[in-house]
Amino acid sequence: MIMRFGYVSHAMALWDCSPAKTITFTSFQKLSKQEREDKLYDVTKQNLEHTIRILHYNIAHEIPLYRLSSSIVPLATHPEVEFDYIGAFTPLWRKIGALIKEHNLRVSFHPNQFTLFTSDKPHITTNAITDMTYHYKVLDAIGIADSSYINIHVGGAYGNKEKAIERFHENIKKLPAHIKKQMTLENDDKTYTTAETLSICQKEKIPFVFDYHHHMANLCEEPLEELLPAIFETWSHTNIVPKVHISSPKSKKEFRAHAEYIDLEFIKPFLHVAKKINHNFDIMIESKQKDLAMLQFIQELSSIRGIKRISSSTLQW
């Protein structure tokens, strides 16, 4: 069983390398037309250059997974902001794509919790489609739209989970098929359990990104031993191994909050279930210390009898 690792957005080991610098719309409004254009251009250019720095860091450390920042283009989906963020940076998008393809990196996006398809308000669904389209356009500009995924949560329950799920199935029909083909769903820590998310994924033929921390915060009746094989099966129509999210609770009191690093004891039960299936899968670390937490966790795992480190960020068990 091969386990590959990655982290989210910011490389903590790199100085001054945020790929998510932004500008608020309030600040944007105060600028002249030319100043607005210059500001959007400068911030986006810096985010793209920082992303390239991070990719070089990942390549040097043999880190095969990486989640791109959704904020890579500031105000990209704001209805009052017009900005050709694709055409203006074609060489940089292509450079990012070349690095990803040459080194066979698995990159993804994870829009925020407001991108959802369970609302009964049409403008919420419209906004979700706009946001998904933005993420897809970026992947397309990079040249990896057919091999990378955009991960979201199911959404809210709005007092009636069954009705909300019905709306999801209806509203998702409005998302262009080529974008839906590149989306994944993740169980959340308060509303939609692993079993409920799995059922939706199976009906819509959407790959399931399993989050173990969320699962433990929002348990369902079905045991993980039964759920995980079916979760992995949702990836069978793709050419990519399943991906899971790993993080640890900040504390018993703040169980849903992410800790700085990974607590191996918290994760062990999941790993033992995964080992019984013995299926290769990828792990996205969602701890606050990001790449540093990932490398420390890999080091701890590699000290366990039977687990072999076969590269900087890949283990065999």
Swiss-Prot record:
Enzyme class: hydrolase
Record-linked InterPro entries: UvdE, UvdE_bac, Xyl_isomerase-like_sf
Alphabetized PANTHER family for the sequence: UV-DAMAGE ENDONUCLEASE
Family: Belongs to the uve1/UvsE family.
EC number: 3.-.-.-
SUPFAM superfamilies (alphabetical): Xylose isomerase-like
Alphabetic keyword roster: DNA damage, DNA excision, DNA repair, Endonuclease, Hydrolase, Nuclease
Gene Ontology terms describing biological process: nucleotide-excision repair; pyrimidine dimer repair; response to UV
Single GO MF annotation: endonuclease activity
The protein's name: UV DNA damage endonuclease
Designated gene of the protein: uvsE
